[in-house]
Amino acid sequence: MKNLLSLLLLFTVINIFGQTPTPTQPIETSPTAISDVVSTKTISPVKKVPLDEALILIYDYDGTLFTFDLESETIAWTVKATDAYTEMCANKVTLIDGVLYVPFINGEIFAIDNQTGTIFWKSRIGNSTDQTVLKDQLPIIQEGKLFITAQNGNLYALNIKDGSLLWNYKLDSTNNDIPVLFFDNKVFTQSGSSFYSFEANTGKVLYQKSFEEPMSGKPVTDGENVFIANEKDVLFALNPNTPDVIWQFKLAENQHNVRERILCKDKKIYFAAQGPEASSIYALDSKTGTQLWKTDFKDDTIEYIIEESDNIWGYTRKAKLFQLDITNGEIAAETKLTTQPISNFEFPVDDSLFYYSDAALIQFDLKTKDENEVYLRTSIKDNAYSAYLKIIRP
């Protein structure tokens, strides 16, 4: 009996001191510790939807997504994220077969009927309610897959039919705020100082190339090679099949920060770089990296560029709207706006363009230079980060 009591006492002591103590308060998690898990809720099967071409989609800077009927001048439908710790858009929208694919900062991605706002499915990356999970993302959709990178260091491929996870890959950096490139059945993306190529179907890494500087530019292609700028002052041309650098172009002194201000057309690369004394738009031959022209904007900062009808359009931080001839870089038109754009440009069929300001949806008349308020917000928020527009059309 004495031996039995001694044995029981020994087991009790081991049990007490072998357990992990229960904390008296919740353990604080790292601000970057966002779960990699993807959860999905399918509401109805995705189907092809006719386009309601009277609508323009507005992803407002407070994170509200809605469509505005340009004919009746009324809001058609509104969708919001399930939850968000702050009011912010900070993302872009893709339209495929009448379905809108929308990322939200809380990690949610919705597939939405463009006509009614009905949600087909909801996916969520992680489960954070107090962090930005998706930032500056444009869903890239090809061959039934949606590709997107997140602030938890992952590249994801989702099935566009139901939002389910097909594959994901852990990248070098947790901060990923540049859309990926799909080209030749491959996915290209940057993360930290690395540039990756993936097999699109499986997520297999084809190559990972390291650079001396962080790679903060959006990857683009001319149909042959891939181009990406670093955070500092160099644009690289890369072979899409191997990590070989074909050529590199150094920006003018003290210029940097290309990011998403880059595009390709007709075997030429056009990009904008920022600097303390001037911003510049460059045109290069994509095969050789030879500079074709360069246009400077002194004492101002280029925020946005886009190609439309063989012109480079854009705006600056000082609310200057500009139009450049794509062949020689000459300024075809320049207007000092009374409202500061915070979105992309959308071009309807007439001689105008749409942009969003902190106060309204503006339709800018290219002939009269009038800024017409099409939709007016009921309130104005300070320090609006960004908004996004998309005319519903093929």
Label every model-predicted segment:
Residues 1-21:
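Bacterial Sec-dependent N-terminal signal peptides
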Residues 15-17, 142, 327, 332, ...:
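Residues marking helix boundaries in flexible regions
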Residues 22-24, 135, 162, 242:
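Threonine-centered tandem repeat motifs in low-complexity domains
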Residues 39-64, 83-109, 123, 129-156, ...:
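Repeat-blade elements of multi-bladed beta-propeller folds
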Residues 70-73, 113-117, 159-163, 199-203, ...:
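Short loop/turn segments that connect beta-strands within beta-propeller blades
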Residues 358-374:
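Short cationic/low-complexity microdomains
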